[in-house]
Curated annotation (Swiss-Prot):
UniProt keywords, alphabetically: Isoprene biosynthesis, Manganese, Metal-binding, NADP, Oxidoreductase
Recorded superkingdom: Bacteria
Family membership: Belongs to the DXR family.
Protein name: 1-deoxy-D-xylulose 5-phosphate reductoisomerase
GO biological process: isopentenyl diphosphate biosynthetic process, methylerythritol 4-phosphate pathway involved in terpenoid biosynthetic process
Cofactor: Mg(2+); Mn(2+)
Function: Catalyzes the NADPH-dependent rearrangement and reduction of 1-deoxy-D-xylulose-5-phosphate (DXP) to 2-C-methyl-D-erythritol 4-phosphate (MEP).
Enzyme Commission (EC) number: 1.1.1.267
Catalyzed chemical reaction(s): 2-C-methyl-D-erythritol 4-phosphate + NADP(+) = 1-deoxy-D-xylulose 5-phosphate + NADPH + H(+)
UniProt GO MF annotations: 1-deoxy-D-xylulose-5-phosphate reductoisomerase activity; manganese ion binding; NADPH binding
Gene3D superfamilies hit by this protein: 1.10.1740.10, NAD(P)-binding Rossmann-like Domain
Binding site for Mn(2+): D151, E153, E221
Keyword NADP in annotation: yes
Length: 391
């Protein structure tokens, strides 16, 4: 089997680890298109190694710099720009599977385009299903497109369901709890971006690392699981599991529970999504269960981590609210990373956006984009108002 792939977000954490998987594939995975946001220098280095047919960049100026550098090196690889450019990379005829590894709701358009083009989707961009889960899954069914999860938790559930009777009792999503899982509510008001970026277990990009620290990431994953596995919110539970060894669990109607275990290494679910239904040998470190300390689980504290409850509330409400919640969170997280607001301002801004939004029950894609844009404007205004920036 040779699979031809496009990687949207190739210079990010998931994108770089996807290329590590490609490197070990012995030619069974080939890169046809690479896309990034603004890091044209790293994308140039990747192009020199993997020689894709097409390159895409979100930012126009970065695309111009990349095109100039490619011309100077005698590499006749076309460069396209913007969201339309990402969609063009995703829809390239020579591509079999699209790895959507971009961060944020910007992944929605290219993912939908890839689905309409009949491409298999290796989904690492959870915001796509958060913002437009019903529309995305309906399009995938209509086009008979397979969506394979890359998130470790959803990959774990997907693996546990293979060959099983689908009469489920519940899904159990595990969360490391992030770097602040044992901090008091008072202490959370003082944490800095540098504190939040020190994740104890996983190697991830900055936005998702902050979401992990606030437990917003787990709330987004609850919504993603609802749509990927067609299960009610009442049947999805979140447990804090500090060791990050059990990646998620499935409880069946008879009370049996299956789990998928392994070291916290994103290359494993990435490879599984790209090679499914096969399993390829790896040379990466493996879990030695005899050397593993006790595995512990506890329920999350929603008072200290209100973002989790906000996300689940948005998911239960549905309609346009998940897109608003997600967009407001993106703005707030980037403001926190820039030291413009405090950590606990993130859920405050998200809550205010959700409360102010004029809800739509069944938005189409343009309406979802409008809700997203409104929430970004609203959250941006709130960033400049009353805040508790850490010293």
């Amino acid at each position: 089997m040779i699979k031809r792939i496009a990687i949207l977000g190739s210079t990010g954490s998931i994108g770089r680890q996807t290329l590590e998987v490609v490197d070990r594939s012995e030619g069974r995975l080939t890169v046809q298109a690479l896309a990034a946001g603004s890091n044209w220098k790293e994308l140039l280095a990747q192009i020199e190694i993997y020689r894709p047919r097409l390159a895409a960049m979100m930012e126009t100026e970065a695309a111009e710099r990349l095109a100039e550098a490619l011309w100077e090196r005698g590499l006749p690889i076309p460069v396209v720009t913007g969201e339309a450019g990402l969609a063009e990379a995703a829809c390239l005829p020579e591509v079999d599977t699209v790895v959507t590894a971009v961060s944020g709701a910007i992944g929605l358009g290219p993912t939908m385009a890839a689905i309409e083009a009949g491409k298999e989707i290796a989904l690492a961009n959870k915001e796509t299903l958060v913002a437009a889960g019903p529309l995305v899954m309906a399009a995938a069914r209509r086009r008979e497109v397979t969506i394979l999860p890359v998130d470790s938790e959803h990959s774990a559930i997907f693996q546990c369901l293979q060959g099983q009777d689908r009469r489920l009792a519940r899904l159990i999503l595990t969360a490391s709890g992030g770097p602040f899982r044992d901090k008091s509510l008072e202490a959370l008001h003082q944490v800095t971006p540098e504190d939040a970026l020190r994740h104890p277990n996983w190697r991830m990009g900055p936005k998702i690392t902050i979401d992990s620290a606030s437990l917003m990431n787990k709330g987004l994953e609850v919504i993603e699981a609802r749509w990927l596995f067609d299960i009610d919110f009442d049947d999805i539970e979140v447990l804090i599991h500090p060791q990050s060894i059990v990646h998620s669990m499935v409880e069946f109607a008879d009370g049996s529970i299956l789990s998928q275990m392994g070291l916290p290494d994103m290359r494993l679910p990435i490879q599984y999504a790209l090679t499914y239904p096969e399993r390829w040998q790896t040379g990466w470190p493996r879990l030695d269960i005899t050397k593993t300390a006790a595995l512990t689980f506890r329920r999350p504290d929603l008072e200290r981590f209100p973002s989790l409850e906000l996300a689940i509330t948005a998911g239960r409400t549905g309609g346009s609210l998940p897109a608003v919640m997600n967009a407001a969170n993106e703005v707030a997280v980037h403001a926190f990373l820039d030291h413009r607001i405090g950590f606990m301002d993130i859920p405050r801004i998200v809550r205010e956006a959700m409360e102010a939004h004029e809800w739509q029950k069944e938005p189409d894609l343009p309406a979802i984009r409008q809700a997203d844009a409104w929430a970004r404007r609203f959250a941006t205004e709130r960033v400049g108002e009353g805040r508790e920036v850490s010293a």
